[in-house]
């Protein structure tokens, strides 16, 4: 949280750009402008020490960025707010179920990939409370009528989640159930209120699934899981906060060289064999493609797949299927470069995990989002 605040402070440089219509956290219509141009919120921001409830309200007022410059939906701070570090009893107000033109494409580069601070994760380290705010948990309605969270994904704009096709269709429907919900802004799945020391996060946003779109080329009968990528449309828009933000898609011209640093994150199995209730992160290297092909001879990997990991106790296995393989650009922006697809065992030395390459599906992602946002 305080890493978020440091980021927020360092971002305070003058922002030129046309204002846009927006809705404040209290429901009033206003304009999306630079924080410097919004006197009420700037005055609140100048308080020292900065109260936790003010930090939370500023975060919920953010409506985009210009580079690293935050823009806010300008309006007065509510006269009475409970100054508490606990999560509010209600989740941040979610957006309308109406169709918004800006939801027809992934979030623009100046509004995504900014970190405010196994398929399960092995050897991972615990994330900060507000780290990787685009992470999503996919929930399924089981035959017993309960909700089971079995896959991961990432938020790419207010309305859409990027995940794996095998998290949407095929065997998972029989083994687990029907995809019905997405949870955003989660940190510790065992706690109703996520706190580190005296700082607490907002309540996670639980949003119903409207529709899901596995890639048409995917079949769970194919052992190599080619085209293992999918899009989930939310029934209502996610509200951007410090704890919920979209990630950028990798440029389709970008290269990932062997040995490049990439990251996975999720709530997966740790070395003691148990799922982690707390969001973990893990740094992995891109694995040599030819060596990876040799390891997976029976699967015939294609050019649309990436191999990463292969270091003992450091890999992703089933619990975070559909979760992201990510990299940080030199200017500090996070991009999703891959989607967790499959692997053999967990954290086996010399055996990398296999990920669907996002760069090879940019056109399909954009077209699917545009055609379904109606």
Curated annotation (Swiss-Prot):
Domain Clip: 21-74
Recorded GO MF terms: calcium ion binding; serine-type endopeptidase activity
Keywords tagged on the record: Calcium, Disulfide bond, Hydrolase, Metal-binding, Protease, Secreted, Serine protease, Signal, Zymogen
Keyword presence, Metal-binding: yes
Tissue specificity annotation: Expressed in hemocytes.
Region (Disordered): 83-114
Main location, first listed in the record: secreted
Domain Peptidase S1, chain residue ranges per copy: 121-370
Location in the cell: Secreted
Covalent S-S links between cysteines: 22-73, 32-63, 38-74, 151-167, 292-307, 317-346
Activity regulation remarks: Inhibited by aprotenin. Not inhibited by EDTA, PMSF or leupeptin.
Record-annotated active site: 166 (charge relay system), 228 (charge relay system), 321 (charge relay system)
Ligand binding (Ca(2+)): 186, 194
PTM comment text: Activated by the removal of the N-terminal inhibitory propeptide.
Propeptide residue interval(s): 20-120
Record's signal peptide: 1-19
GO BP term, example: response to mechanical stimulus
E.C. number(s) listed in UniProt: 3.4.21.-
GO CC annotation, single: extracellular space
SUPFAM superfamilies noted in UniProt: Trypsin-like serine proteases
Induction: Upon physical injury. Up-regulated 5-fold after 6 hours and 15-fold after 18 hours of injury.
Biased composition (Polar residues): 83-97
Record remark: domains: The clip domain consists of 35-55 residues which are 'knitted' together usually by 3 conserved disulfide bonds forming a clip-like compact structure.
Family indicated by similarity: Belongs to the peptidase S1 family. CLIP subfamily.
Function: Serine protease which, by cleaving and activating prophenoloxidase (PPO1) after immune challenge, plays an essential role in the melanization immune response to wounding.
Protein name, entry field: Phenoloxidase-activating enzyme 1
